[in-house]
């Protein structure tokens, strides 16, 4: 969630367990989110750059605003996401929320249990995850019809 990303602090990164601590996310709940090695590498590069240019306070916001005492706003994060997508050659309108949907869909296509996806997305109800994760067409093609298993 974009608001959760905006509120991340440097100290929320647990690189030894490859987790991000999300404090007071939606529903005012704390949770852990997975941290991919690729993302960790990118965040380390960002941290070195930000620290070298005095953009970040020790233990401060992972994505500080113009005043490092404040986090970067969600509008600025949205613009950064759109800019990165254009730089990557994506011609579709992509938002942080679109990336969240894609994350869930790719996990489903990779046959990750929906309850694990529920936890990763921070949903309290499985029904929310089921709505969120669009039915993956790749999975639909792999479903064997019960008619095909009958010995007629």
Regions found by a protein language model. Name each.
Residues 1-7, 27, 110-112, 123:
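A short, glycine-centered helix-capping/turn motif at helix boundaries
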Residues 33, 78-119:
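Short, basic (Lys/Arg/His-rich) helix/loop patches that form interaction surfaces
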Residues 33-34, 38, 135-152:
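DNA/chromatin major-groove-contacting recognition/catalytic segments
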């Amino acid at each position: 969630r974009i608001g959760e990303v905006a509120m991340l602090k440097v100290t929320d990164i647990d690189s030894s367990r490859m987790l991000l601590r999300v404090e007071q996310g939606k529903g005012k709940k704390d949770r852990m989110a997975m941290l991919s090695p690729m993302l960790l590498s990118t965040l380390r590069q960002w941290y070195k750059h930000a620290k070298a240019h005095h953009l970040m306070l020790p233990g401060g916001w992972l994505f500080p605003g113009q005043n490092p005492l404040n986090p970067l706003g969600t509008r600025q994060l949205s613009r950064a996401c759109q800019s990165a997508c254009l730089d990557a050659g994506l011609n579709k309108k992509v938002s942080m929320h679109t990336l969240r949907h894609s994350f869930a869909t790719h996990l489903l296509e990779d046959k990750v249990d929906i309850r694990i996806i529920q936890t990763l997305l921070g949903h309290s109800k499985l029904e929310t995850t089921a709505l969120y994760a669009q039915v993956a067409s790749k999975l639909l093609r792999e479903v064997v019809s019960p008619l095909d298993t009958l010995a007629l």
